[in-house]
């Protein structure tokens, strides 16, 4: 038996001509009444067959015939007189079909020769190995289930236009195995997190996506209108305040994995719609949260990739090692050691330095900023991008942490952390502020900042204050950016690579 090399014929006509020719083939199928049948049920998957019979040689398969039924997309085809081959791809992988008129009948074989790459086909047959050792299905029954009207990208060039990969993700998934692997890893990551949380006695919940008051984060919301209630609503920027209401209600460990929406810029790290996991545990604090978060991320890597040592953009990252912990000023002085303690406590010096880095300190967020907020801004300019290894930055200032519990020992700071890896924030957590009077005062301060022009300052949420007045136990809470975590685990340079359908400008 002669076996072809797996190549794809060159396109000889433009795409419009190809589509026209395929529509004509579809018209003929409609006339025959067999255009889109739905009565074939595959019983096997390509990857399962490849794995199960990996050690079965040609003689073994001939001695013990294995009948299979498989369906998928035809990715390659080579017609060679009275024997033809096709590579068929299903959701698990690929397997080769061997087709002859003696096996499937002359009419079916003639029809098969007219089928196109991208068509969805199905076969029943017997497994065998070719002379080159490739596991194949000797087709006894062959059917066309769905006609592809548009041609797939050329095998050797693939889908090279990056924006087209995002815009037509369905094509990207067909032709790019690495893309399929990325989203399988994403699914495994989220499944691992759910299992980890379940094992730690957390209850998964769902809270509203439409909020009467945006809260739980410093961000600009999307605004909509509820017609029946005739009221302005906001797509949620965070679920935090609802989840903490559940802590008040007696659910002592809760978590949610869901979408957040922020009407802000698009970048390699930001998408207006993104997935967040937030969890809250009564009778814990931010130090417990750091230990728990470290264990969760390490386990997610192991479950998704089989290892806690990963490669990201050509550099190794070992999640098995203990994560570092630094204060904001310690991080600044580690990566910009010329700064003295005195300079980092000098308002005028900090503002001058921020100007040198191109920060507009005249914007509303900086007008009444204290030392802590200025230190944080300098940290973002000098140290944040340098935090390659997993590092918890701790002890954030009160003025930028309106929902976090204040430190009992150090005035002006909170029991808060942010986790950084590869120079980007992955998680944010803190001991929760459960003093209703302190929380009300901080909300009022946020309202003052909003009135001064800070669009990201929080609103005053009177119902949340009312909930706290019923008493919330000491609590720790944390949010983990699922998209950024998956970027890390899949070696993806941009958030668009880990979103199935990222937001893009309208197509012209």
Curated annotation (Swiss-Prot):
Pfam families: tRNA-synt_2, tRNA_anti-codon
Compartments (UniProt record): Cytoplasm
Enzyme class: ligase
Binding site for Mg(2+) 1: 418, 425
Record carries keyword Mitochondrion: no
GO biological process entries: lysyl-tRNA aminoacylation
Record-listed E.C. numbers: 6.1.1.6
UniProt keyword terms in alphabetical order: Aminoacyl-tRNA synthetase, ATP-binding, Cytoplasm, Ligase, Magnesium, Metal-binding, Nucleotide-binding, Protein biosynthesis
PROSITE patterns referenced in this protein's UniProt entry, alphabetically: AA_TRNA_LIGASE_II
Chemical reaction(s) catalysed: tRNA(Lys) + L-lysine + ATP = L-lysyl-tRNA(Lys) + AMP + diphosphate
Cofactor comment text: Binds 3 Mg(2+) ions per subunit.
GO MF annotations, alphabetized: ATP binding; lysine-tRNA ligase activity; magnesium ion binding; tRNA binding
Domain of life: Bacteria
Subunit structure: Homodimer.
Similarity section: Belongs to the class-II aminoacyl-tRNA synthetase family.
HAMAP family with a match to the protein in the record: Lys_tRNA_synth_class2
Name of the molecule in the record: Lysine--tRNA ligase
Organism: Burkholderia cenocepacia (strain HI2424)
């Amino acid at each position: 038996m002669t076996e072809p090399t797996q190549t794809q014929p060159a396109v000889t006509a433009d795409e419009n001509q190809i589509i026209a020719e395929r529509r004509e083939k579809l018209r003929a199928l409609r006339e025959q009444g067999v255009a889109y049948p739905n009565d074939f049920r595959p019983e096997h998957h390509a990857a399962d067959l490849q794995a199960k019979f990996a050690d079965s040689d040609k003689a073994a398969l001939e001695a013990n015939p294995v009948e299979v039924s498989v369906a998928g997309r035809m990715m390659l085809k080579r017609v060679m007189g009275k024997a033809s081959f096709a590579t068929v791809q299903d959701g698990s992988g690929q397997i080769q079909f061997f087709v002859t008129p003696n096996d499937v009948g002359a009419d079916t074989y003639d029809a098969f020769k007219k089928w196109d790459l991208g068509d969805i086909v199905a076969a029943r047959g017997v497994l065998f190995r070719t002379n080159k050792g490739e596991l194949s299905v000797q087709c006894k029954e062959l059917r066309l289930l769905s006609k592809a009207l548009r041609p797939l990208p050329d095998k050797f060039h693939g889908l090279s236009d990056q924006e087209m990969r995002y815009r037509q993700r369905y094509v990207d998934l067909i032709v790019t195995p690495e893309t399929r692997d990325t989203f399988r890893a994403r699914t495994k990551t989220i499944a691992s997190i759910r299992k980890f949380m379940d094992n730690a006695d957390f209850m998964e919940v769902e809270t509203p996506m439409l909020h009467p008051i945006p809260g739980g984060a410093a961000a600009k919301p999307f605004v909509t209108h509820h017609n029946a209630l005739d009221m302005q609503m906001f797509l949620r920027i965070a679920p935090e305040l609802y989840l903490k209401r559940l802590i008040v209600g007696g659910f002592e460990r809760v978590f949610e994995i869901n979408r957040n929406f922020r009407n802000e810029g698009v970048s390699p790290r930001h998408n207006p719609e993104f997935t967040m996991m937030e969890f809250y545990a009564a009778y814990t604090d931010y130090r417990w949260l750091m230990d728990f978060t470290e264990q969760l991320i390490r386990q997610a890597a192991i479950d998704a990739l089989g290892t806690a040592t990963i490669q990201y953009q050509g550099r190794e990252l070992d999640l098995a090692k203990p994560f570092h912990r630094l204060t904001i000023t310690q991080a600044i002085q580690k990566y910009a050691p010329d700064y003295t303690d005195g300079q980092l406590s000098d308002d005028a010096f900090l503002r001058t330095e921020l100007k040198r880095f191109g920060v507009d300190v005249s914007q509303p967020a900086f007008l009444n900023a204290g030392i802590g907020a200025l230190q944080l801004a300098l940290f973002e300019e000098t140290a944040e991008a340098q935090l390659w290894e997993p590092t918890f930055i701790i002890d954030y200032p009160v003025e930028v942490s309106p929902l976090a519990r204040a430190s009992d020992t150090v005035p002006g700071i909170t029991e808060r952390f942010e986790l950084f890896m590869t120079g980007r924030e992955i998680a944010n957590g803190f001991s929760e502020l459960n003093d209703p009077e302190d929380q009300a005062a901080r909300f009022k301060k946020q309202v003052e900042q909003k009135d001064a022009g800070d669009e990201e300052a929080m609103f005053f949420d009177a119902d949340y204050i009312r909930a706290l007045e019923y008493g919330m136990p000491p609590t720790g809470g944390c949010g983990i950016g699922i998209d950024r975590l998956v970027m890390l685990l899949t070696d993806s340079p941009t958030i668009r690579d880990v979103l199935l359908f990222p937001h893009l400008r309208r197509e012209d």
